Amino acid sequence: MVHVRYGGQNGEQYELAISENHIVVRTESRSSLISDRPFEAAPVSSQARNILNQFELSTRFSQAGVEVLHVKEPSQDGALRDTAREILNQEPEVQFAGRVLIDPVSQQPIVYTENLFVKFGHEEDVSFCQEILGRYGLTIKRQLEYARNAYFVSAPPNTGLAIFDIAERLLNEESVELCHPELVREFRQRQAFSQQWHLKETTIGGKTIKAHANVEAAWKLSDGTGTIIAIIDDGVDVDHEEFRSSGKIVAPRDVTRKTNFPTPGNRDNHGTACAGVACGNGNFGASGVAPGAKLMPIRFVSALGSQDEADSFVWAAQNGADVISCSWGPPDGTWWDDKDPLHKQKVPLPDSTRLAMDYAINKGRNGKGCVILFAAGNGNESVDNDGYASYEKVIAVAACNDFGTRSAYSDFGQAVWCAFPSNNGNPSQTPGIWTADRSGVVGYNSGSTNLGDQAGNYTNSFGGTSSACPGAAGVAALILSRNPNLRWDEVRDIIKRSCDRIDPVGGNYNAEGRSPFYGYGRINALKAVELALPAQPEPVSIFTAVQDVPINDLQTSQLSLAIANTNPIKSIKVTVDIEHTYIGDLIVSLNPPGECGVLPIILHDRKGGGADDIKQTYDEVSTPGLTALKGKIPQGTWTLEVADKAQADTGKIRSLTIELGF
């Protein structure tokens, strides 16, 4: 077993086994060693070919030129694996042949590279960081711009499994906050099975479909104009007639090839369909949910967990994306097979990707934050095992069908935030979602009216949570087009409040109105757009206390202010200005007057690691605990309490401001 730890020295540790029956290989020409067409296979000796005949292809990472091979007749001792490695490493055409890790639950292969993600504390200077990396023999490939003192580094060739020991030793360095090897897994898009009933009430084949998201009605108020939706996927046919309008395409990028041309590969149909669902113009054959939005196509076909993955979010944020749609994630289990081990595998979110998402959320839209959505998944399994879709700062989108109930494959769990219409398989009233397809007969539709249109420019059978996610992303764009001043979490809250509670019997909604299958329900686009504009302004009073109160190690400091108003509270915002050199040491609480009968409300709970200072406004969306103060009389003494829970760093409370609406 080897171990990897995400979240720093105190983060969760994940165990990975060394496979006895897999090898990973890369050829000099990037050609495959195993092919259905022998003349296309990489040239190797007869001895190597004989050993390869005992293996079969497990998975291929095409862009890296790497493939994972599996022994046809598995053993327990790894003898054939080791013999194959020895023979193949002597072949001139073979760049390397190495061991492979497997997830002990799902038995899925995981490839480790000789690269590491390393993040030092905020206070360390560059020369010190470089000195530490040099001490471990590491070469800096890139200093990462999305997190302070973060590096993508490589170990010397043939480091092999020792890369895990290096990562653990680095984590024991006092100056290192985060460190993990670059682990890559099979990357799967969120698609399942095979006219735009999801946008409005529609009659198809004599059947009236009413299971829509009320999108067409929302267009009277907003069509997405002024917003940009980033589609991170396998590329987009940017020459498609529904994307050809002037200025439609913004900042295209291929993070895998490192070019600005996100052209799909020969079999890459997924991204074009997703883009069509989100923001197709609707001028020729299919409208997106937000037809007025601009499209930022980002092609990402590298492996799950790679540095390219993190780069996708940074590119989107730096180039003006408002909304980021991700219809991909870890491999799903077979939705109808409850014995599939993939159902139980837990795939963590790498720190490198998490920090890139945080960068988009904290820095995107001039600090208001990009809205990030993920497809919940198509395995009929728990989304909570998927570290990507279950990350607390993203919106996980489930799928509901044309009957207004759960799509059979759709993942479920506590992380599901909302649902959007998609296909179902059987039974179904429609083939699926009608959307843009790669132009001509090269996409999902080979040129048949049974599959879409005769020209092959549109498909009628897109589906899965792959389709639900960009649909919800389009609604987020409608919201921001109506009110561009909203923060990312306010958009998420509006989506929550807009949802229609479908399937009341089968939805298993709890007391808070949340379902494991639909989250808060099926998005209602019209309601969401109506909620985007604030209600009529209410009388507001602002109360401020300014005083430099020292924050000493392992002590608690307080700053108080008195409020005399006796009107019931309708809304509240709390702004704090705290200077400190390591905010991960701090717990910050607001203590209302005792007469309110409300317990202290935690505003900040040791998050942020070694970052400096807390200058932030908290409201009922970002801090739901503040809702307990609605209807209370504010008269009395309010106290900001700051508890320092670790040694070495100090600071001071500068000010406290409380804004009350009456």
From Swiss-Prot:
The listed locations are: Cytoplasm
EC number(s) per entry:
3.4.21.-
Q: Which residues form the Peptidase S8 domain?
A: 196-529
Q: Which GO terms describe its cellular component?
A: cytoplasm; endomembrane system; intracellular membrane-bounded organelle; membrane
Q: Does the keyword Calcium apply?
A: yes
Provide any one GO MF term from the record.
serine-type endopeptidase activity
Query: What domain of life does the UniProt record list for this protein's source?
Result: Bacteria
What's a Pfam family in this record? Peptidase_S8
Where the protein is mainly located, per its record? Answer: cytoplasm
Q: Which residues form the active site?
A: D233, H270, S466
Catalytic class of the enzyme: hydrolase
Ranges where the P/Homo B domain occurs: 535-662
Alphabetically list the UniProt keywords: Calcium, Cytoplasm, Hydrolase, Protease, Serine protease, Zymogen
Q: Matching InterPro entries, A to Z?
A: Galactose-bd-like_sf (IPR008979), P_dom (IPR002884), Pep_S8_PrcA (IPR034054), Peptidase_S8/S53_dom (IPR000209), Peptidase_S8/S53_dom_sf (IPR036852), Peptidase_S8_Asp-AS (IPR023827), Peptidase_S8_His-AS (IPR022398), Peptidase_S8_Ser-AS (IPR023828)
Q: What does the record list as GO biological process? A: protein processing
Q: Which PROSITE patterns match?
A: P_HOMO_B, SUBTILASE, SUBTILASE_ASP, SUBTILASE_HIS, SUBTILASE_SER
Question: What role does it play?
Answer: Degrades phycobiliproteins in vitro. Has a substrate specificity similar to that of trypsin.
Question: Into which family does the record put it?
Answer: Belongs to the peptidase S8 family.
Q: What is this protein called?
A: Calcium-dependent protease
